[in-house]
Amino acid sequence: MATPFISDLDSLLLQLSPKDFLTLRQAVQGVHVMGGIGSGKTSGAGRALAGAYLRAGMGGLVLCAKPEEVELWIDYCKQHGREDSMILFDATQGCNFIAYEFARKGGAEAASSVTDTLMKILEAADTAAGQKAGKAGDEFWTKTARQMLMYTVSALYAATGNVTAGDIVRFVTTMPTRNPTTDEEKAALDKNFAVGILHQMRTNPARNIPDDLKEQTISYWRLQYMAYPEKTRGSILAHVTSSLNRFNTGMLRKCFCADTTIVPEMTMAGAIIIMALPVLTHNEDGLIANQLMKFIWQRAVESRNGLAPQFRERPVFLYADEAQYFVNSYDDQFLSTCRGSKACVVYMTQSLPTYYSMLGSEKKDAVDGFLGKFNTHIFHLNPDTRSNAYASALIGRGIQKRRSGNATRGSSKQHGRNYGGSDSATYTVGDSENQGSGKNYAGLIFKTEEGESSNEGVGTNRAMANQQGRSYGYNSGGGTNESVTDGYSENMDNLVESNWFSTALKTGGPDNNFEVTALLFRAGGKFKRPMPGVSDNCLLATFKQQR
C-alpha cells in the first residue's frame, strides 16, 4: 500500500513557535541550515526537518558524507513509520546511468543528456581530487571535453545501440591522431576499434540518429580532432579518461555501469533512497557516487511534470548534511526551478568557508548566489566570523533606539578657625639745646652799619604709648548637588550584530536542558511571534533534542 502524503502547499509541516509553522509552500522554496561543530544543527533543525518531511509522506534522496548518517536515517524512518519506504543504495544496488538516460530520453536527445551527466562526473572527480573550478582556461577545457564526449556517445550509440564508460575510454584512446602514411598503418586501421565504430555508424547503424549529427560526428573525428596540437589533444584525453576509468573497476562500475535496481522516479512514489556510500568511507568514489545520483535525480525531478499524474503530486525532498561535499554548478539552476516540481531541498553545512574550500575562492559570487536561492535560513551557534557577518547582513539594518543617561552626585563640607593677636609699646625721650651769637654788617654806598645778636635755649620732651589687641574667628560651610539626565537616540544599525551568533544560542545537551536554539530567517516572512527587537521575518526557534 502506498504511503499517504500531503500535497496542499499550505499544509503545516513543522511548528516553530506557539503560533508559527513551516508550511509545504515554504519548504519547496528551500531551507539552508548553518552552524558550527557541536552547535546542534543536526540534532536540532536537521532532525526536526527530517521528521516533518517523513511524516508528510514525501519521497526523497538522502546524501551521506559520514557513515553514521546512514544509521541516523534508518532510525528516522523507523521513528516516523517510513521503514517500508526506505531503500539503501549500497554496493549491492545499481543504477546504470547511461542506460537510464537513454531509456528516459531516447535517441539523439539522450546522447546530449548522457553527455551532460558525464560532464558532471568530470566536475565531481575534479572536486574529489581537490582541483577547484573557476581558474583561467577552465572554460576551454570544459567545452573541448564536452565536445569529445558528445561525439563519442553519438558514435557508440548509433553504431552499437549501447554505451558504456569502458567503451567511451576505449574509443577515445584508439582514435588515430593522424592520417596513415604507410601500408602498415593503413592495414592497422582495419582492426582499429574507433575507426570500426565510425564505419559501422555510417554503413550499418544499430540506432538511427539525425543525419546532421552523424555528419558532425564524422567531421569532428576526421578533421577537428586531428587538427588539435598534440599537447592540447593529450590534455583533453587525460582529463576525460582519468575520470571515466574509475567506472571500469570497483564500486562505481558495479553501482553505475551494470544492472539497474534503483531509479530516481521511485522517490516520486514515496521511496526514501539513502546513499549508503558515504564519502568518508569510499573517499573520492563515494563523493562521485553521491553527486552522480544527485544529478540524475535532479534532472528527473525537473521533468516530472511531464509524467503521469501519480508521479507529479507527491512532494519529494533532497537532504544533504555536510552539503559542501555535494554542491556543484547545477544546484543554482535546480534551486531556481524545483519549486514547480514540489521538491524540498535541505542543505546543511558548518560555514561559508567550507563551500569556498571545496569549490574554490574564485567561486565566492557563485556560492553567494546559490545561497540566495534558499528562502529560509536557519542559523545555529557559529564561531566563524564570515558566516556570522553574512547572517547579520542577510537580516539587514534598521532604526535602533539606544538609551543614554547620566547621573551625578556630589557633596562638600568646609570648616575653618582663625586666631589673631597683637601687642605694641612706644617710648619717646628727647632733649634739645641751642645757643648761638652772631654779627652782621650791612654796607651801603658811602655808609657803613654794624650790629650783633645772640640766642640760647634748652628743652626736654617725653612720650609713651602702649597698644594691645586680640581677635578670634570660626567659619563652617557645606553643600550637596545631584543631577540626572535620561534620553534616547535613533541610529541605523544592524538588527542583529554578528557576534550574537557566536554567544547567544543554545547548543543542546544536559547543560541546556537538551534544547537547541537557532535564528530562523524567512525572506518576506511575517511571523506572529517574531524575535523581539528585530524584524517580523526573524524568529528564535527552539528544537528539543532526543535524549
List the predicted regions and their residue ranges.
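Short gly/pro/ser/thr-enriched loop/turn and capping motifs at secondary-structure boundaries
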Residues: 68-70, 93-94, 352-356, 386-387, ...
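Long, cytosolic, alpha-helical-rich C-terminal regions that act as interaction/scaffolding modules
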Residues: 487-490, 517-521
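Beta-rich nucleic-acid/ligand-interaction surfaces
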Residues: 70-71, 317-319, 414, 471, ...
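P-loop NTPase motor domains
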Residues: 2-343, 500-514, 520-531, 542-547
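Positively charged interface segments
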Residues: 492, 531-533
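Short coil/turn linker and secondary-structure boundary residues
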Residues: 106-109, 163, 362, 382-386, ...
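Positively charged, hydrophobic/aromatic-enriched amphipathic segments
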Residues: 427-437, 491, 496-506
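Conserved P-loop NTPase motor cores
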Residues: 31-39, 46-49, 232-241, 246, ...
